[in-house]
Regions:
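Beta-strand-connecting loop/turn residues
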Residues: 64-65, 74
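Short, charge-rich, low-complexity interaction segments located
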Residues: 46-55, 67, 86-91
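Enriched for short, Lys/Arg-rich terminal
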Residues: 70-102
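A beta-hairpin/wing motif
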Residues: 58-64
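Basic, Lys/Arg-enriched alpha-helical interface segments
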Residues: 2-57, 72-75, 98-102
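Enrichment for repetitive, rod-forming helical segments
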Residues: 41, 65-66
């Protein structure tokens, strides 16, 4: 199955690769290789990602990045890519030592 990127996903990938290359060429190349691996894996295992509450959207988390995608009849569309490392919690933590004062 063919994999396509939404405009916002493609923009994020370009910007993230440029940012990483600015700090380390190897890090930038590793990120691009990670994106290629996700595309290859989704071709073989389209339903690998977890279903999200958004209708027909799945999420695959790979090495610190979230890849949100939709499976269409003839194509898989990656609709969003984002870092999962520096993202605040969406809900309160289960950790009893969690500090609510941020």
């Amino acid at each position: 199955m063919r994999i396509v990127l939404s405009r916002s996903a493609a923009d994020y990938i370009r910007k993230e690769a440029a940012y990483l290359r600015g700090h380390s060429r190897a890090a930038g190349e590793a990120f691009v290789a990670r994106v290629k691996a996700v595309r290859r894996d989704l071709t073989a295992f389209a339903e690998a990602g977890q279903l999200l509450p958004v209708p027909s959207v799945r999420r695959l988390i790979r090495e610190g990045y979230r890849f949100d995608y939709r499976i269409r009849p003839d194509v898989i569309e990656i609709v969003a890519v984002s870092s999962s490392v520096n993202t605040p919690l969406d809900m309160p933590s289960d950790d009893p030592d969690f500090d609510y004062e941020t």
